[in-house]
Amino acid sequence: MTTLEIKNLDVSFGEKKILDNLSFTLDSGQIAALLGPSGCGKTTLLRSIAGLIQPDAGTIRFGKQLVSLSSLSLPAHKRKIGYVPQEGALFPHLNIAQNIAFGIDRAAFTKEQIKQVVKEMLMLIDLVGLDMRMPNELSGGQQTRVALARALAVKPAIILLDEPFSALDAQLRAELRTDVIKLLRTQKTTAILVTHDREEALVSSDVVALMRDGKIMQQGSPEQVYSSPTSATTAMSTGD
């Protein structure tokens, strides 16, 4: 079943077109790796899906729900989207429990239910006992885990990860990536992972989408994309 369907998406900033007639689909439970050079529109695509940018044209559909301009301002828990920006972007003035609980719909849950969700998330990311710590008291890897828990706490239909491991050293990056992907698989969460790392895409994803100049140039399994680039542009994007 298709969870995400994007058709003919255009986004411009001033005179500069960032996304150019972009189309993309992702099935339920799949993890997609989004690769491409800096400035090709990867983050803009995620922010458009998350409702943080209003596209100039095109459609974004989650299952049967068409995301319209009027729905873009809805809270993340109502749109069922989890978003982890680069370096996690935790709220520095909130403790870990408050960060995790931030996006939960307080109209739909009691305080005790919210506490239970936070407890479950802390267990899920292996940070039990750190709920009262402040973000600056955590390591980079721990902050990334908390950002992931905050996104998962809203029970998203899809989670968007914008280079979540980029600030970490190679060993920690590999360890945390393994843990995060395992967590997403366990939760059967549909996800898009933005990365510059070809190896990361190969070991983490079911689908690789290569971007250049605001377009998806090629989409397929990691093996298909890396073994059979369809154009010189695609070959450049894969490093071949």
Each language-model region and where it sits:
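ABC ATPase "signature
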Residues: 219-220, 228
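Short coil-to-helix segment of the ABC ATPase nucleotide-binding domain corresponding to the Q-loop/switch region
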Residues: 94-103
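Conserved ABC ATPase "signature" region
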Residues: 65-69, 112-130, 182-185
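A short, proline-enriched helix->beta-strand linker immediately N-terminal to the Walker B motif
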Residues: 153-157
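ABC ATPase NBD coupling module
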Residues: 67-82, 106, 111-116, 229
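Conserved ABC ATPase signature
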Residues: 134-138, 142
